[in-house]
Amino acid sequence: TEEARLTKALFKLAVDTVGYGDFTRAKRGAGGDPANRFLDHGNYLAYGLGATATWVLGLPHGLAVLHGKTRRGGLVFDIADLVKDAHILPQAFLSAMRGDEEQGFRQNCIEALTRSEALDFMIDTARVVALGTAALASGRPV
C-alpha cells in the first residue's frame, strides 16, 4: 500500500539521519533492539490518544476504515496514524541512539504530543472526516 511505502521510507530516513545501522521493523513486539521496543511503546501511547478521540466524539472505536475488518479497534489505529510518524517514529530512533531508558523515551513522547496538541488534532480531524462522510452518505452538500 501507499501507506506502507511511505512508512518504510520514513524509517529509512530516520535510520540514515541518526546513523542507526541495520534496522528491520519487527512485528508484534518481537524486536529486541531499542528502536523497535521504543516504536512499540510509543505506538501504544498514540493508540491511547486515538481511543480517547473516538470516545470524545462518540465514534465506534472498532469501526474498520483503513485498517480493515480483521483488526479490533480499527478506527483507533487509523486515528493514531495521524501522529505516529511525526512524533513517535523520530523519537524512537533519537532515544535509541542516546541510550534512553523507557521512561525517558515515554516522557519525551508525551511532551512532544502535548506540545503539538496531538489529541486536539486527532479529535478535530476525525470530526471533520466523520461529518463529511455523514453528509456524503445523506446526499447533503459537504
List the predicted regions and their residue ranges:
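Active-site helix-to-loop segments that bind/position phosphate- or nucleotide-bearing substrates
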Residues: 1-142
